[in-house]
């Protein structure tokens, strides 16, 4: 620990040749030399050989998330998180920042745990863990702040949700839609309309999906991450259930957009 910042230290003798084997598995998967199933099986075998190798569990968790298996992802991520937590002194209250490569396996495992809870709709757990990762790594290289507002809204903490959504809407288009929904639920229809129109301007695909077109045609323009079809699809797949509870909000969006 230095200047209230923690850094994991892994002696070379801890994982030995397993580190090289792990990197070979990652390279083989990245270059399509092995299938997703082969990749997962190899990672599982390595995890059995060395249960304290945090990054193996983290990568397993992301592989399960890609397979839309959030329970398996959560199980893998929690194993990595537990291995890391055993190395953190109980009295530690500082930062664990991404800038130090040794910290990244732990932060990857923590973020995978958040994503798994998001997909399992365990919103309170997702908020608690997101607060934790943002305290550890305020620079937020992984983008946890782009989950926090939506998760807070779904826990019913509207006041804090508004604060987070308002702060980050300019950098993340789905937050304009979330902000609009929050205003609509509060009966603030003019503010809702303003937020939704910001959303239409920054990511039109989300509006298309909320209006019933679940497969919008990609526009022939270059989008940044926030305005992309991928972002819209991820948002709709993850957060549309709350919209489904308020058909009048969907009608309002449809009326504004069309």
Feature locations, PLM:
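Flexible helix-coil transition and linker loops at the boundaries of alpha-helical arrays
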Residues: 10, 45-49, 81-102, 134-136
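TPR-repeat structural position
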Residues: 34-36, 70, 77, 123, ...
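TPR/TPR-like (Sel1-like) alpha-helical repeat modules
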Residues: 71-86, 131-140, 166-173, 184-208
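TPR alpha-solenoid repeat register
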Residues: 56, 90, 109, 143-144, ...
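Alpha-helical segment of the N-proximal tetratricopeptide repeat
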Residues: 15-49, 111-119
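Long, ordered, amphipathic alpha-helical scaffolds
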Residues: 2-4, 181-258
